[in-house]
Regions:
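Conserved beta-strand/loop positions that form the S-adenosyl-L-methionine
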Residues: 53
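Active-site charged/polar residues at nucleotide-handling catalytic sites that mediate phosphoryl
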Residues: 108
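Conserved acidic residues
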Residues: 111
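Class I (Rossmann-like) S-adenosyl-L-methionine-dependent methyltransferase catalytic domain
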Residues: 1-47, 57-105, 122-129, 133, ...
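Short catalytic micro-motifs in class I SAM-dependent methyltransferases
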Residues: 117-118
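A conserved beta-strand element that flanks and buttresses the S-adenosyl-L-methionine
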Residues: 114
Length: 198
């Protein structure tokens, strides 16, 4: 699927389809966001300027902001951002895809960027493009937390709810090209430091 197809499917998704815990209960869904915000806080410096790329309705962005982070919530779907604003009207939101992030930031860079349940839906080429744009939005030495799974049998998703996986070598090559250095972490997602590419 192209990035445009993934974005369109995401924008049209029923709220109950965007996360499996929402089918359990709304409380379980929002509690999972609080738990993930706490995990992110273990690797992101206190009070940092943070971008949640692909924030959806704010499941993680809202509790991370409540922990004292300066969160900018970015999503390609205005419908998702409207749902977020209903719960947290003071949270900064930006409607943009990866290509639109730079125009919002201008010369500013974030201390940290995270993308959870975003990259898994995209092709290899689109994922590399997105990660490159997120790296460019991050200060040198900043932190990126990416839900970017590896597998012994990597493959590209064939639908927007599929999961694209990478080999360790594919990821290592991408990191060297983009300017990411893997950081040891207990998190269930990859944690990277923004370094010079090459």
């Amino acid at each position: 699927m192209s990035a445009a197809d993934v974005i369109q499917a995401w924008d049209q998704a029923d709220p109950s389809a965007i996360h499996p815990l929402r089918q359990v209960s709304e409380d379980a869904y929002w509690a999972s966001g609080e738990a993930q915000a706490s995990m992110l806080a273990s690797v992101i410096p206190e009070g940092a300027k943070v971008m949640d790329f692909g924030c959806g309705d704010g499941r993680v962005a809202i509790p991370l902001a409540a922990l004292g982070y300066d969160v900018t919530a970015v999503d390609s779907s205005q419908r998702m951002l409207d749902r977020l604003a209903d719960r947290a009207p003071d949270l900064t939101t930006v409607q943009a895809d990866a290509d639109g992030v730079a125009s919002h930031l201008g010369r500013r860079r974030m201390d940290a960027v995270y993308a959870l349940a975003v990259l898994i839906h995209h092709s290899y080429a689109d994922c590399l493009h997105i990660v490159g744009k997120l790296r460019a939005a991050t200060k040198l030495g900043g932190i990126l937390v990416l839900d970017w799974p590896v597998s012994e049998t990597p493959g590209e998703a064939d639908s927007w709810i599929g999961v694209t996986t990478w080999s360790r070598q594919q990821q290592a090559d991408a990191c060297a090209q983009i300017g990411l250095e893997r950081v040891d972490s207990e998190l269930p997602w990859g944690v990277y430091r923004a370094v010079k590419a090459g």
